[in-house]
Amino acid sequence: MGRAGRIVRGIMVLGSVLLLASCGDSFNDAYCEANNHRNQQTVEHLTNVLEQKRNQPGLYLARARCHYFLGAYAQALQDASEVIRRLPNKADAYLLRAKAGKMLGQIPQALQDYSAAIKFQPTAEAHYGRGLKYLREYQGKDREALEDFTAAIRLDPKHVGAHAFRAQIYSRHEQFQHALADSETVLKLDPTTTNAYCNVGFAHYALGHDAEGRKFLTTCYQKDPDPQTRGYYETEVNKVLYARKPKRNSGGNYVAEGGVKTPYDREMERQQN
């Protein structure tokens, strides 16, 4: 791009920022996006305008968003906090501060900010973000995470991440039919999600659909040849297969895991007698 083109582009960005300033919050944080090559230029112009118009919370929120996408999380948090100071009910500011705080390792504060964002304006993104914090950072919070992922799906049925992590929780608690349904949804929404093939395959095994399970696991290993992936899922499958085998109790009789006799257990006892 020539010098004239750069000048025109700069004028366009500056014009957008000035329009943002004149409209207050109405344009909010719309001028920076992930991987946008103009983000740095936009944040510089926002900073210049803020030197003249410090009474515009919308400009601070816009700059916070730019800082976030540029990886300047401390600055993003600072600008979002300024918006919250001026507009204590601004859900977008709490959500952005939660995301920046998460990247800075401020987990308890991030969790509080996600909750505030949900209180003032429930969104799939806020529920999903809080659900991830419960799942990854806290022990014994699976129920809370599950509720958040379910809320995110209710608000956005096509939220791939919420379906994927809800499937993970269902599988952990041996609710394999639900885990299978969510993992299948992930594949429908995004067939490039490689581990979803493995998750569908394992859920089929857990439900006794071995042939179907093996088909999906084979596809998963073809798409992801990492030996660690195969090792993990084959170990989980072997656990399922081992759990199916009848065990002998102290009296020499066959009994299933947990001490509850199944028709298969009783048949094994009959054959032994």
Locations of regions flagged by a protein language model:
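Short coil turns that delineate tetratricopeptide repeat
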Residues: 54, 88, 121-122, 157, ...
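Helix-start (N-cap) detector for alpha-helical repeat units in TPR-like alpha-solenoids
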Residues: 57-58, 91-92, 124-126, 160-161, ...
